[in-house]
Design a protein with these regions (language model features):
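N-terminal Rossmann-like NAD(P)+-binding subdomain of aldehyde/semialdehyde dehydrogenases
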Residues: 3-121
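Rossmann-like NAD(P) dinucleotide-binding subdomain of oxidoreductase/dehydrogenase enzymes
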Residues: 110-184
Length: 184
């Protein structure tokens, strides 16, 4: 039996209704209802981030690490409750792993060598605005880890969270933006 477009739409509507997804808030701490608005805000932020020193970016990352540790249990419980996947104890450990082991600016190094053919210099530079689709498994861990890496490199990011993990994802994004504001 061939599947028509209307059948696909009916299936999508049925699945979304079962998930009972609330509308996302708009514009507060980097949460937008429309993707284009999020992209425009990230472009504006990118103009600031790319001018930041490595020390400034590391200061934000340090604040993010602190906030992850302070909120690990809350995010773990939210993730398990919202998605029905995983267990709280393991997710708490994963959040601490993200806070303790995710590389920051220390991995952004300059390499240079010279020889008979001249000087070669390799320096890392930002890509700009990065788009990321996040999973329903480990939503907050993914957002937090990816942000620290992207920020270390001087980039900004727009996340499109999985609908089954929207509340947990919004919590993590708010936490990141609070850390950025608190760090100056």
């Amino acid at each position: 039996m061939p599947i028509s477009e209307s059948m696909v739409q009916d299936i999508v509507q049925e699945v979304m209704a079962k998930m009972q997804i609330a509308d996302a808030p708009t514009g507060k701490h980097g949460i937008f209802k429309e993707m284009n608005d999020a992209i425009e805000a990230a472009k504006k932020s990118q103009l600031i981030v790319k001018k930041m020193s490595m020390d400034q970016r590391e200061k934000i990352i340090t604040c993010i690490r602190k906030k992850i540790k302070e909120n690990a249990e809350v995010m773990a419980r939210m993730g398990v409750e919202e998605t029905g996947m995983g267990n709280v104890g393991d997710k708490i450990l994963k959040h601490h792993l993200v806070a303790d082991k995710t590389p920051g600016t220390e991995v952004i190094t300059t390499t240079a060598w010279s020889g008979d053919r001249g000087l070669t210099l390799i320096e890392m530079g930002p890509f700009g605005v990065i788009g990321a689709i996040t999973p329903c498994t480990n939503p907050s861990e993914t957002i937090l880890c990816n942000t620290m890496g992207m920020l270390a490199g001087g980039n900004t990011v727009v996340f499109n969270p999985h609908p089954a993990a929207i509340k947990t994802s919004i919590y993590a994004i708010n936490l990141l933006n609070e850390a950025s504001l608190e760090s100056g």
